[in-house]
């Protein structure tokens, strides 16, 4: 087995949909093609939105599809915990390292205030933070704390971050202009996605991150955190998103594309084969097992643009 370690990192806020399945299939195929393994991590940072029953169902769905993981989830393993809701002490340690570098500051801005400020937005829809609370004095911070609990952000430099994406190719983002100072922790104490995934991927030995293209803009921020924390960054490959036939992005609200409904109509091999077809891994939508796709898998065959599902394919 090679040293490649990929991962499934779903957020169990509902049943999987086709987009989640496609990402999982590509992550699994990429790791297995290299003779590597797959870790399953449950990204349930917001535990109220992610009841354990969805995580259990998610494991059953992945197993049914033939996307068997080697470590993590309810199976456990040497790099637990594998549920982010159980990892607060681990994140706290990394957060303290960043705070000790003088890079963390409290932010009292509300979401509505940020959107009302007409600040530019990142490609994933977030506001590029204008630095409103970046240079508050200790007195100003103390006064604001009387009225509102702050979230916490990390300072970023005016610096370009360059990397070569395994699917999308060369990519550059400026941390200050394209991202802005970003959240590490919410006002309610929950740690932010950017910090949690960096800490978890590093401690689980993940060497390859495969995820949707909607997270491409997160990569520069995460590479910055890897550097600050002295951790080795993985390779990244961002796969094109699946769109409904009318061009809408798929979501867990699209019940017709959820695995619950798909399982009632198709076999696992039919679902895998049709996904392999739209992602350029085979010339026709014939039924396939995941194992049968390993040998010929190549990122060169995967499209670079978002994929509109053909009518009546599912």
Regions picked out by a protein language model, each given a short descriptive name:
Residues 55, 88, 111-114, 126, ...:
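Alpha-helix initiation and N-capping motif
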Residues 46-56, 244-246, 295-303:
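Short, mixed-charge aromatic SLiMs
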Residues 82-97, 121-127, 148-158, 278-293:
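Short secondary-structure transition/capping segments
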Residues 96-100, 202, 263, 276:
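Alpha-helix boundary recognition
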Residues 70-73, 233-236, 282-288:
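Short, surface-exposed acidic
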Residues 112-251, 258-262, 311-314:
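Active-site cores that bind ATP or allylic diphosphates and position pyrophosphate for catalysis
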Residues 1-15, 38, 65, 142-143, ...:
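Non-catalytic terminal extensions that flank enzyme cores
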Residues 1-118, 122, 213-214, 218-231, ...:
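N-terminal Rossmann-like or analogous alpha/beta NTP/dinucleotide-binding catalytic cores
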